[in-house]
A protein has these predicted regions:
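Active-site loop-to-helix "anion-binding N-cap" substructures in soluble metabolic enzymes
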Residues: 1-219
């Protein structure tokens, strides 16, 4: 927070997505900063009902969230389907939340050279019947890269993100890269000009490393 208040660079936007229990207190504390708050997931139901333990997009909006991450690989691995993600995205948009829509291939799919096919399928299914994508940000996170310390080669990364952008005929959404981004490898990937930002996981838990990533990104 202190770094954000002192930093006058208007080029970057930081969205912090904490556990749901911290959204309200953080959104209040961050009101006078350029930091914004989002959620890590939401339930697909647009209305309240018998969904014990779940939090929908309306509830997240009411406690101060402006963004929500949907389609994260960890949730996909727990059985979340493209159809379910599509329902969640529609619900979030109706609640005026900006969606960070995660897509990416597994190691097996990469080895079989199916990356583009997988990405196309996830985009088509996840955004089915959604005409206005102005509140959607795509996060490309190769499943094999998350938490492993491995990142795609610059040329492969550039090609994948360019492919993602090519799937949108009208307004092209911002595309982030996520997958083992840290303060050591950021200098290697920040200059790939098709990347619009980063979805940072483990490295964001250390304020020192996170600030270092921001500084290196804009130097």
């Amino acid at each position: 927070i202190k770094f954000s208040k002192n930093n006058k660079n208007s080029k970057f936007r930081i969205v912090y997505c904490p556990p749901n229990t911290l959204i309200r207190p953080l959104s209040k504390r961050l009101k006078k900063t350029n930091l914004e708050v989002g959620a890590q997931n939401c339930h697909e139901s647009e209305n309240y009902g018998a969904y014990t333990g779940h939090v929908n997009s309306k509830m997240l909006k009411n406690v101060g969230a402006k963004y929500v991450i949907l389609g994260h690989s960890e949730n996909r691995q727990s059985g979340e389907t493209d159809k379910l993600i599509n329902l969640k995205i529609k619900s979030a948009i109706k609640s005026n939340l900006k969606v960070i829509f995660c897509i990416g291939e597994t190691l097996s799919e990469k080895r079989k050279k199916r990356t583009n096919k997988v990405l196309a399928q996830q985009i088509t299914s996840g955004l089915k019947s959604i005409k206005n994508t102005s509140n959607i940000i795509i996060a490309y996170e190769p499943v094999w890269s998350i938490g492993t310390g491995l990142i795609p080669k610059p040329n492969d990364l550039s090609n994948s993100i360019s492919f993602i952008k090519s799937k949108f005929r009208k307004k092209t959404p911002k595309v982030l890269y996520g997958g083992s981004v840290n303060n050591k490898n950021i200098t290697e990937i920040k200059d790939i000009n098709v990347i619009d930002g980063f979805l940072i996981g483990g490295a964001s838990q250390s304020s020192k490393k996170f600030i270092d990533i921001i500084k290196k990104t804009f130097n």
